[in-house]
Amino acid sequence: MVSSNFYKNLGPRKLTAIIDFLHDIIEPPKIHEDIAIHDIKILQEASPNDISFLSNPKYSEFLKTTKAAACIVPKNFTGEANPNTVLIHAENSYFAYGKLIDFFYTPIKSYPAKIMKSAIVADSATIGKNCYIGHNVVIEDDVIIGDNSIIEAGSFIGRGVTIGRNARIEQHVSINYTIIGDEVVILAGAKIGQDGFGFSTEKGVHHKIFHIGIVKIGNNVEIGSNITIDRGSLQDTIIEDLCRIDNLVQIGHGVKIGKGSIIVAQAGIAGSSTIGKYCALGGQVGIAGHLNIGDGTQVAAQGGVAQNIEAGKIVGGSPAVPIMDWHRQSIIMKQLVKTSNSKLKK
């Protein structure tokens, strides 16, 4: 249930207003009554004054019994539904749901154009128009922050860092040696631009390699909580436009992540590896160093990648192999365990 402590409901909204708002991404349905829609809820909890959505076919059974006045469904949905529920077909029902959230809700917390008194901002820093700088933020010399950006409480922005327009930096984020584009979101606790894990071993002693690269983050990127992104040793660490990186991900020095890639929680990418455009790495995936992962590659959760992967491949397992081979290996392993157990019983 949505808490009114944190989010303001902008409803009720007329069903026709909802259809008009989504008109470019849905097939407008025929409606017999223009009712008021009060809220968005899951199918199981929706009332006759609510709208719902279906994006995962696992939940299609609930459409038969839902009380929702309307439901956004995939374009090709032809299953059974409550006859009293208006079905709104969308090319991407989950995307339409996301747009609908924006139509119904807004955060109660606001960020006025203000620098809080407890913030420490260097005289040589440049703060754009309409920015919010929160309590106990530290902004060092020669930092540039673009217009309409938000830096929340306790964050540290190191000397020379550039942050573009419309950025949102949440609480207790640390950023050093980094250039960031526009429309970037960095969630709480992220650490960006620190030294990478680089040492040379001489006569049993591990000597630190001074890192002289930086981190470059493109436009419209989202970076999760407690992520760590190391700056390059010599080559820069680069995250291109439109990437989405989940919580607790480690990105090593000199890594390049291509445009539009998605990296799920607890994945780790070792130094100097290149991830192509529009790749997807599942949770806890590990990528060894100095590898090239081709555009459009998908790696299943907990996959361990130790060699280059051609573009468009889907792999899984550790060491990672083509996904069908991984499924076969899993089946064979189960059969071996059954055979072994039956022999032990004899």
Swiss-Prot record:
Alphabetical keyword list: Acyltransferase, Lipid A biosynthesis, Lipid biosynthesis, Lipid metabolism, Repeat, Transferase
Q: What reaction does this catalyse? A: a UDP-3-O-[(3R)-3-hydroxyacyl]-alpha-D-glucosamine + a (3R)-hydroxyacyl-[ACP] = a UDP-2-N,3-O-bis[(3R)-3-hydroxyacyl]-alpha-D-glucosamine + holo-[ACP] + H(+)
**EC number of this enzyme:** 2.3.1.191
Gene3D superfamilies according to UniProt: Hexapeptide repeat proteins, MurE/MurF, N-terminal domain
Listed GO molecular functions? N-acyltransferase activity
Keyword Transferase part of the UniProt annotation:
yes
| Subunit and partners | Homotrimer.
UniProt similarity note:
Belongs to the transferase hexapeptide repeat family. LpxD subfamily.
Q: What is this protein called?
A: UDP-3-O-acylglucosamine N-acyltransferase
Gene assigned in the entry: lpxD
